[in-house]
Amino acid sequence: MQQKIKILEDLRDKLYLWKSYNEEDLEKIMSAFEKFPRKEFSTFYIPILTDTLLAEHLVAIGKTFSTNTCMLINIISSIGNMVWRYKLYPSDKVFNFFKESTTLKKVNYYVSLNISSFPQYSSWEERWDYLISIPNISPKRKSIENFHTEVKKILSTKEKIPIQVTKELLTILKNYINTTKMSDYLIENYLNTIHKLEQELKYSYDSVSL
């Protein structure tokens, strides 16, 4: 473990001094770093992977090499897992970087995996439109599963979902189970979510009529 910590510390130090490296070397450094927040969780990594200044450096690298898709994917994956798994508190600058990356092909899939873990996400004005757009992100088979997970997460919090959004969610999920071959277990799982959304919709209509 000490050896792994030393490797991570060395990578962090290099990322702090990222302007000293060319794009090719930096891509290799970023690729090696990304494995740490993504792979097996370790409390020994917490001091480094909750470093807010390190996250700011990663954003700066991403903005500087905005056409390097491979580097951007590793940056988004790194920050996303730092926020989700290691509870890094991201600045608004970091969240804005994620929002900007929702329009980038290939990169946007990795954004969708962890953006809802950001504390700023719940107050983002476009969050509902974004949620509805997730199934259209390539690879679509993985994105619909991610979308379903996000819907279940929202339902578990008992947060009120706007009526029109609930209708959209129902349409997407019903269309998916009607056009896709899946196991009985998965069908039951999706039907359970659909039932909860229908209950949510009924409750919303009842509240409006009162």
Stretches with model-predicted labels:
Residues 1-34, 205-210:
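N-terminal "cap/leader" segments of large eukaryotic alpha-helical scaffolds
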Residues 2-12, 42-61, 85-99, 121-133, ...:
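Amphipathic alpha-helical scaffolding segments comprising HEAT/armadillo-like alpha-solenoid repeats
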Residues 3, 7, 21, 50, ...:
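Non-membrane alpha-helical secondary structure
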Residues 4, 166-210:
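Eukaryotic acidic, Ser/Thr-rich intrinsically disordered low-complexity regions
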Residues 10-24, 58-69, 97-112, 134-142, ...:
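Helix-loop junctions that connect tandem helical modules in alpha-solenoid scaffolds
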Residues 16, 36-39, 87-90, 135, ...:
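Short, flexible coil/linker elements and helix-boundary hinge sites characteristic
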Residues 25-44, 70-83, 108-120, 143-158, ...:
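Amphipathic alpha-helical elements of HEAT/ARM-like alpha-solenoid repeat scaffolds that form extended
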Residues 101-178:
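Conserved binding-pocket/active-site segment within a compact domain
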